[in-house]
Design a protein with these regions (language model features):
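GST-like domain detector, emphasizing the conserved glutathione-binding G-site
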Residues: 1-151
């Protein structure tokens, strides 16, 4: 029988070869790995994302707000290619220290607001524009329950 004692290393080292092609997307790194300034457009909302299920949620919300006539929901969408590591660039990490898409920079106020995680962005937009989030307690609880379920 072999020795079953496990001693964790003093410093964890990420094994770049482990996990295949997609392992690097969620690698355990804190902070940026490269300098990269994010583009900024002319609209109040700057969305940094990709067409993944979580990435698309915010785009759908912004489009629905625009359809309701909320011009403050105009946005510029910028591609964050998670396959090439864009999410680890300094500009993106400044908005989302967890290096995950989507991330939103709301520049509609004098001090820009960074919002990350799809659910947090959806709640921010719903509260900001007074749409899609009920105020009646039972309806709000049901809405938030479904929102949290999808994350």
């Amino acid at each position: 029988m072999s020795d079953a004692t496990y001693t964790p290393p003093a410093v964890w080292t990420w094994d770049k070869e482990s996990g295949g092609r997609f392992a690097a997307i969620n690698r355990p790194i804190a902070g940026p790995t490269k300098e990269h300034v994010l583009p900024v457009g002319k609209h109040p909302m700057q969305l940094y994302s990709l067409g993944t299920p979580n990435g698309v949620k915010v785009t759908v919300m912004l489009e629905e707000l625009l359809a309701l006539g909320h011009s403050g929901a105009e946005y510029d969408a910028w591609l964050i290619n998670i396959g090439t590591g864009d999410q680890f660039g300094s500009g993106f990490v400044d908005i989302n220290p967890n290096s995950k898409i989507p991330a939103l920079l709301d520049r509609s106020d004098p001090t820009p607001i960074r919002v990350f995680e799809s659910g947090a962005i959806l709640i921010h937009l719903a509260e900001k524009f007074g749409a899609f989030l009920p105020t009646e307690p039972a309806a709000r609880a049901a809405c938030l329950s479904w929102l949290m379920w999808q994350m």
